[in-house]
């Protein structure tokens, strides 16, 4: 992986192979023009024979010059190719190393995150398990307590019903006893009235007899006198 944070603004870009070849060709053409111009000036001053010989020599020199330039361009191109291949290999090596390092870092990060997740899951899983176990225990206790309360309520309800039955019986007994008491009192009053009436009648009879006896004794006394 090639780092994207490097700055290239401070370095000048290297000319490409095509630009260098074009510059070499232009330089060759300028040399040809300079050489041909100087030869023509010299030939104009010489005889026609020397002019022909000078043209032959100039063309030969130009051909030699062109061959040297061609060789130089070929060598330059080969050097550029070698340099590009070397740079390409270095770039590939750097890229592979960078990818390997990045993969190792990512694997380490993933491994650490995985371990942290497992640790967190285990920690909270244990806490949740403990809480759920306690919850089950509390629910069992609540159900047992509810069952006890239900039984107690049924017992209390039964006791209350029995108490109501007993109270109803007691109240009925009290009512019956009260009625008996009232009846007994009435009977007693009637009996007392009858006894009193009888006593009064007896007393009246006795008083009448006594009065009669007294009258008879009084009459008897007066008779004897």
Swiss-Prot record:
Residue ranges the record marks as coiled coil: 65-218
Cellular component terms per the entry's GO annotation: chromosome; chromosome, centromeric region; lateral element; synaptonemal complex
Q: Where is this region: Important for oligomerization and fiber formation?
A: 68-73
InterPro entries recorded: XLR/SYCP3 (IPR051443), XLR/SYCP3/FAM9_dom (IPR006888)
Main location as per UniProt: nucleus
**Record keywords:** Cell cycle, Cell division, Centromere, Chromosome, Coiled coil, DNA-binding, Meiosis, Nucleus, Phosphoprotein
Region annotation Disordered: where it falls in the sequence: 1-59
Q: Nuclear localization signal: where is this motif? A: 87-90
In residue numbers, the region (Interaction with DNA) covers 52-57, 87-90
Q: Which GO terms describe its biological process?
A: cell division; meiotic cell cycle; spermatid development
Biased composition, class Basic residues, residue ranges: 1-11
Entry's localization field: Nucleus; Chromosome; Chromosome, Centromere
Per UniProt, the ranges with Basic and acidic residues bias are: 44-53
Tell me what PTMs the record reports for this protein.
Phosphorylated.
Which is an annotated GO molecular function term of this record? DNA binding
Phosphoserine modification, residue list: 36, 38
Q: Which domain of life is it from?
A: Eukaryota
Q: What does this protein do?
A: Component of the synaptonemal complexes (SCS), formed between homologous chromosomes during meiotic prophase. Required for centromere pairing during meiosis in male germ cells. Required for normal meiosis during spermatogenesis and male fertility. Plays a lesser role in female fertility. Required for efficient phosphorylation of HORMAD1 and HORMAD2.
Under PANTHER family, the record lists: XLR/SCP3/FAM9, XLR_SYCP3_FAM9 DOMAIN-CONTAINING PROTEIN
Q: What is known of its domains?
A: Composed of a long central coiled coil domain. The N-terminal and C-terminal regions interact with DNA.
Q: Assembly and partners?
A: Component of the lateral elements of synaptonemal complexes. Homotetramer; the tetrameric helix bundles assemble end to end into long homopolimeric fibers that exhibit a transversal striation with a periodicity of about 20 nm (in vitro). Interacts with SYCP2. Forms a complex with EWSR1, PRDM9, REC8 and SYCP1; complex formation is dependent of phosphorylated form of REC8 and requires PRDM9 bound to hotspot DNA; EWSR1 joins PRDM9 with the chromosomal axis through REC8.
Assigned protein family: Belongs to the XLR/SYCP3 family.
Name of the molecule in the record: Synaptonemal complex protein 3
């Amino acid at each position: 992986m090639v780092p994207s944070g490097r700055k290239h603004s401070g370095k000048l870009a290297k000319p490409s192979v095509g630009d260098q070849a074009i510059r070499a060709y232009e330089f060759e053409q300028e040399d040809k023009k300079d050489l041909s111009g100087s030869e023509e000036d010299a030939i104009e001053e010489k005889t026609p024979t020397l002019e022909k010989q000078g043209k032959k020599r100039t063309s030969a020199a130009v051909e030699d010059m062109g061959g040297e330039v061609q060789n130089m361009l070929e060598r330059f191109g080969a050097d550029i190719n070698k340099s590009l291949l070397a740079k390409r290999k270095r770039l590939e090596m750097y890229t592979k190393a960078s990818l390997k390092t990045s993969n190792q870092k990512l694997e380490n990060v993933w491994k650490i995150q995985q371990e942290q997740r497992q640790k967190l899951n285990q920690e909270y899983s244990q806490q949740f398990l403990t809480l759920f176990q306690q919850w089950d225990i509390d629910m069992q206790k609540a159900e047992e307590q509810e069952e006890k309360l239900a039984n107690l309520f049924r017992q209390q309800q039964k006791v209350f019903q029995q108490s109501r039955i007993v109270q109803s019986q007691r109240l009925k007994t009290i009512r019956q006893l009260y009625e008996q008491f009232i009846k007994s009192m009435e009977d007693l009053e009637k009996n007392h009235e009858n006894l009193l009436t009888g006593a009064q009648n007896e007393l009246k009879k006795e008083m009448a007899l006594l009065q009669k006896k007294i009258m008879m004794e009084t009459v008897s006394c007066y008779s004897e006198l």
